[in-house]
Regions:
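Beta-rich carbohydrate-recognition and catalytic domains
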Residues: 1-139, 145-200, 214-260, 278-284, ...
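Beta-rich accessory regions
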Residues: 217-218, 231, 243-467
Length: 467
């Protein structure tokens, strides 16, 4: 019997998970909020809330924190921040009525308790609030409790910053807003790029996030802008590295694809409680990123998903990724604690190895225990990584996912299989791939081969209790 639902990844209990809405780590608990619909043919959606203690792998569902209230027709994704100590968080979300979207705020109290309380506090960003003559359709807020002292970026963070989307769906623009108290906001203007952004041929940018990381190579603190490009009905998520000053983003690294698998889009960073989650000297060392695994993005059709047909749910979030900045590039690896969590599952598996693939290739084959057939293959050939699921009858029309690797002293490969999800990290995390792979049963194991002069230097494997 198959079970497509993963055990370590976040899914909606039923219905369609549409987007990660916000994430918060308090130092003791992980809180992830997600936008979902209880049924695929229902327009109204909610903000779900899941919690995990210590590590982000053992999720418990809490009551929904937001649902559409008349005249709203939808509540969409935004940000969750905890600017101060205490058992509460601020929710910034997109409220949609028949007249269009605007950005609203709510206060969530009793955050760590079994049942949180939510108090809506109304619109904070819309045309009337900002004194504008006509609607601007503000949506998708990324809120940072403070941003930068430009004279000392390592200190930074005084006041509030909001990065949002405005304008029509066909021609959106990214805009910057600022506030001293998170309630009254000033529209500072559209975000402008200086230098080669790599986005000249991608006019539709959505789902923006901005974080700050210290580059491990030069020691400087940079701003990392994460965006999703909508092109021909398909999402492509990536990042730019540079320096944000007011509404101007000075580019160091142009738009770079963040994940090369079949099913990763609209990433969200995990916010923390300043001075509580991490010390001030650690706060720019790494970020924790979740992405949505749903195929093409906003225009994805959940009715085509085998998990919805067989089990009544569609889509999940990726595993959280520990994300660092090295030489202007993001490196993504599994969050610590995963190898300890997998043995407590029923069916999850992981294979991780150091390999030498400067000549030849190493291929890891995923086997379906119900049929004995190949469900997917992952091949590392030194400068090239491929995830191929086309031999699987449930993915027969799909082209392989491919990426080119930069030169590395040592090649490495980590593969996690959890239900119908497969996530791959290569060469220390310089390339990541997230793809759905459906099994008629479950993943029955890894068959690893080295060819053409390649070799496996060392490896380890962990698996759930029932495999």
């Amino acid at each position: 019997m198959s079970s497509h639902r993963p055990e370590l990844h976040i899914t909606a209990q039923h219905g369609v998970l549409e987007a990660p809405a916000g994430a918060l780590f308090t130092g003791e608990q992980w809180h992830v909020f997600h936008q979902y619909r209880s049924q695929p043919d229902v327009k109204k959606n909610n903000w779900g809330h899941v919690v995990s203690a210590d590590t982000p792998f053992n999720w418990a569902h809490r009551d929904d924190v937001l649902s559409a209230e008349a005249p709203e027709v939808q509540v969409r994704a935004g940000s969750v921040v905890a600017p101060r100590c205490g058992d509460e968080a601020e929710l910034f979300f997109t409220s949609v009525t028949d007249e269009g979207p605007s950005i609203h705020r709510a206060l969530l109290t009793n955050l760590s308790g079994p049942q949180s309380d939510v108090r809506r506090e109304g619109s904070v960003v819309d045309a009337p609030v900002l004194g504008l003559d006509k609607p601007q359709d503000f949506r998708s807020p990324c809120v940072v409790p403070g941003w930068a002292d430009e004279d000392d970026r390592s200190e930074g963070h005084g006041g509030w910053l909001m990065l949002a989307v405005a304008g029509p769906m066909s021609a959106p623009e990214l805009v910057m807003l600022s506030s001293h108290d998170q309630q009254s906001w000033t529209l500072d203007g559209p975000l402008a790029f200086h230098g080669d952004s790599g986005l000249a041929h991608h006019p539709i940018l959505v789902s923006p996030r901005i974080i700050r990381l210290r580059d491990e190579v030069d020691g400087h603190v940079y701003d990392v802008l994460i965006v999703t490009v909508e092109a021909d009905g398909v999402d492509l998520s990536g990042y730019l590295v540079g320096t944000l000053r007011g509404c101007d983003f000075w580019v160091k690294t142009p738009f770079t694809q963040m994940d090369f698998g079949h099913d990763f889009t609209r990433p969200r960073n995990t916010n923390t409680v300043r001075g509580v989650t991490y010390g001030n000297n650690e706060r720019y060392d790494a970020a924790l990123i979740f992405g949505l695994m749903n195929g093409v993005g906003r225009l994805d059709n959940p009715a085509t998903h085998e998990s919805l047909r067989a089990e009544g749910w569609a889509n999940c979030l990726s595993l959280p990724r520990l994300t660092t900045l090295q030489g202007g590039l993001l490196f993504q690896t599994p969050t610590p604690g995963l190898t300890s969590a997998i043995p407590h599952t029923a069916h999850a598996r992981m294979w991780s190895g150091l390999i030498d693939a400067q000549e030849g290739s190493v291929t890891v084959t995923l086997l379906d225990n119900a049929t004995g057939r190949i469900a997917a293959t992952i091949t590392h050939s030194g400068h090239h990584l491929q995830l191929d699921r086309s031999m699987n009858p449930l993915h027969a029309e799909d082209s392989p996912a491919e990426a080119y690797l930069i030169s590395a002293d040592t090649d490495s490969l980590t593969i996690i299989v959890d239900g119908s999800t497969v996530e791959v990290f290569a060469d220390g995390g310089v390339i990541a791939m997230a793809s759905r792979v459906y099994f008629e049963g479950i993943c029955g194991g890894f068959d690893v081969t080295a060819e053409g002069g390649a070799s496996i230097l060392r490896y380890f494997e962990v698996a759930g209790e029932d495999v």
